[in-house]
Regions:
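TPR-repeat structural position
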Residues: 32, 73, 112, 132, ...
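Alpha-solenoid helical repeat architecture
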Residues: 11-15, 51-56, 90-97, 130-137, ...
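Tandem amphipathic alpha-helical repeat scaffolds
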Residues: 19-30, 60-71, 96-110, 137-150, ...
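Loop-centered beta-sheet repeat module
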Residues: 156, 160-226
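Amphipathic alpha-helical segments of tetratricopeptide repeats
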Residues: 40-47, 80-88, 120-131, 160-171, ...
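Long, mid-chain structured domain cores
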Residues: 54, 62-161, 165
């Protein structure tokens, strides 16, 4: 399984086609060292296929996927531009990878409606892919998407399907550990703390065994998030500060650490972390986290309720577009409390009602269809 030729190669380009296929197998298996070596070989030969648009598109798709595996936090709005410069592929294999990877890109930069549509288009072509492991990879990434949009149960279900397939194949232990890590996140969202910790520990054991620091830090970040969601701020900060020292462009970890410092009353530390995170998000044009950082900055600076309201409402219009009702509920509830403390009861009442409506929508969205 997994060794088939994914696209029909033009005569004379069999060697490059095989190299590209092998490269994808290493990328998909998260074997970073092997993937890097193959990329160097491919890059030295790629100039010889300038006339073959299909192979060049395939290379551009895999190069995006490779960059994502190496450093998904550097993925920016323009990271898919090289792929988009090609005509829409008619070949089923290429069309599948185009839609699948476009879904990964859109989800990473916070364009969740585009991601949803792209994953749906890819799923229609999944039957054209005679490779069970590719189906597992697809389920894993769709599970990650469901987690990103606060659908914890759907995420748990999809990632468990992926894990089951990966676990049946030798050489895919890293993928199983990635599934364990993501199931841990889904359990965190579902407030199943013990189960979350169990899955994170399994993932950590595997990543320590292969001594891949990037993967170890990913789990440490998620443990930090798990402690943060239980309001165990000092413990969360301990994990997250290590991640942020070693991965200074990790805007997600910067955001959570800043929020925990704010909860602890460390406002100047939080302010510095917010400034760093905001700057990283400007660089990669991540709209979602720009809104999160702006709102957190207003909360941390103890803005008057009306100034906070302007910042929250800017974010809410984006969150509505992307159907991220969980965030609307969280931020409007904070805003309602701010108005209540200032004795502005009409505004407070309005936002308490509005956040309760957002809460209902979040629960509806969470339900398994």
């Amino acid at each position: 399984m997994g060794e088939y030729i994914m696209i029909v190669s033009t005569k004379g380009n069999n060697e490059i086609t095989k190299l590209l296929n092998d490269w994808y197998l290493e990328i998909r298996s998260r074997r970073i060292g092997n993937a890097h070596q193959l990329k160097e070989i491919i890059d030295s030969k790629i100039h010889s296929i300038e006339e073959d648009q299909n192979l060049l598109l395939y290379y551009s798709l895999l190069d995006f996927r490779y960059q994502f595996v190496i450093d998904n936090l550097s993925v920016s709005k323009s990271s898919f531009d090289k792929v988009e410069a090609f005509d829409m592929p008619t070949d089923n294999f290429l069309a599948y990878y185009y839609h699948f990877f476009k879904g990964i890109h859109a989800s990473t930069i916070g364009e969740y409606q585009i991601a949803k549509e792209s994953y749906e288009n890819a799923e229609k072509l999944l039957d054209c892919i005679p490779d069970e492991l590719e189906k597992a990879e697809f389920y894993y990434k769709v599970g990650a998407f469901h987690y990103d949009i606060y659908q914890g149960l759907l995420s748990y279900k999809k990632v468990s399907e992926a894990r089951e397939i990966f676990a049946q194949h030798a050489g895919y232990e890293i993928n199983v550990a990635f599934c364990d890590n993501l199931i841990g996140l889904a359990c965190t969202h579902l407030r199943e703390w013990e189960l979350a910790e169990e899955y994170f520990t399994k993932a950590m054991d595997m990543f320590q065994k292969i001594d891949e620091e990037q993967f170890i830090l990913m789990v440490r970040q998620n443990l930090g998030l798990m402690y943060a969601t239980q309001n165990l701020s000092p413990l969360a900060i301990r994990y997250l500060s290590e991640v942020n020292q070693k991965m200074p462009n990790n805007y997600k970890a910067l955001f959570i650490e800043a929020r925990e410092h704010m909860k602890e009353g460390n406002h100047s530390v939080a302010k510095d972390l917010i400034a760093k995170g905001y700057s990283v998000c400007e660089e990669v044009e991540n709209i979602e986290y720009l809104h999160h950082f702006k709102i957190l900055d207003a909360m941390n600076g103890d803005f008057p309720a009306e100034a906070l309201e302007r910042t929250v409402l800017e974010g809410v219009s984006y969150f509505k577009e992307q159907e991220l009702f969980e965030y609307i509920k969280e931020y409007e509830e904070y805003l309602a409390t701010a108005f209540y403390k200032e004795n502005k009861h009409v505004k407070a009442s309005h936002y308490f009602y509005s956040c309760s409506q957002a809460g209902k929508k979040a629960i509806e969205k969470e339900a398994l269809k």
